Design a protein with these regions (language model features):
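RNA pseudouridine synthases
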Residues: 1-294
Length: 294
């Protein structure tokens, strides 16, 4: 059995001539030394497809499925709690706080929404149906059942989900609203950024103004497409980058990006998700209980 309190990463061993699984892992992940892998194996943190521990003597076999539990020493706790809004046999809906990653990545393993929900609900089969950025707060949907998962994933793939965000950004008195903003989004530099390109638009966002307060306005953003950083780049391209965004329009210094300032969260909230349930046919509407302060 896989541990219910954590989600393993999975690797299908590539073709090669390594004598053992351990040798393959050491070459595949050069940043992790051999002793670390030995310690993980000794603690049952490296498993095969049946959930059986793999030890240092296990012979290598191309295509073998290996589950391993990523570990980050001294992982910094995120001092904000998620809120579970809905649970049924197929779906879990949660409000994610700012600064909490949805999935394990980089320096975040246990301090993720997925790991927290798996522990709280005792369900190791939870899988996010979509994702929002670590710095964004608001609604995230999880599949709680393997059999029905594909039906809900198809909703997002086919753009059958109405998504509404709120953002606080500088005022744009010179532009008419509501408006539809289309961009050609291409990979930028560094690799984790996106930028506006010269080709045909591949992203579309509907924008309206909800509230005006001096030099700052509250906007409703409805993405039709789902590009990486779409809302953040779209507002920056209009000259109204989302407040407290360390990436757009200007990339903050590395030292500032690597140190979360809990007093200055990104002013972006996944407010509402609406769709027709693929199983029951009922209209489903979920709204975040979080708010964006000015």
């Amino acid at each position: 059995m896989l541990h219910p309190d954590a989600r393993p990463s999975t690797l299908h061993l590539p073709p090669g001539d390594w004598p053992t699984v351990l040798d393959c892992l050491c070459q595949r992940f050069p940043a992790i030394d051999r002793q670390t892998w030995l310690e993980r194996m000794a603690r049952g943190r490296v498993l095969d497809a049946e959930g059986r521990p793999i030890d240092a003597s296990r012979p290598y076999r191309a295509g073998l499925k290996v589950h391993y539990f990523r570990e980050v020493p001294d992982e910094t706790p995120v001092p904000f709690e998620e809120r579970i809004l809905h649970v049924d046999e197929h779906l879990v809906v949660a409000d994610k706080p700012h600064f909490l990653a949805v999935m394990p990545a980089g320096e975040y393993v246990e301090q993720t929404l997925l790991a927290r929900l798996c522990r709280r609900l005792g369900n190791p089969d939870l899988v996010p149906i979509h994702r929002i950025d670590r710095l964004t707060a608001g609604l995230v949907l999880f599949s709680a059942d393997r059999e029905s998962r594909g039906a809900y994933q198809a909703l997002f793939r086919e753009r059958a989900v109405s998504k509404r965000y709120e953002a606080i950004c500088p005022a744009l008195p010179g532009l008419p609203f509501p408006r539809v903003q289309r961009l050609c989004m291409v990979p930028g530099e560094p690799f984790f950024l996106m930028r506006e390109g010269d080709g045909e638009p591949n992203s579309e966002t509907r924008i309206e103004v909800l509230e005006r307060r001096g030099e700052l306005w509250r906007y409703a953003l409805e993405p039709v497409t789902g590009r990486k950083h779409q809302l953040r780049l779209t507002m920056a391209s209009l000259g109204a980058g989302i407040c407290n965004d360390p990436f757009y329009p200007q990339l903050a210094e590395r030292s500032a990006r690597e140190r979360d300032d809990y007093a200055r969260p990104l002013k972006l909230l996944a407010r509402r998700l609406q769709f027709r349930d693929p199983l029951s046919g009922a209209e489903r509407l979920f709204e975040s209980g979080l708010t964006l302060d000015w």
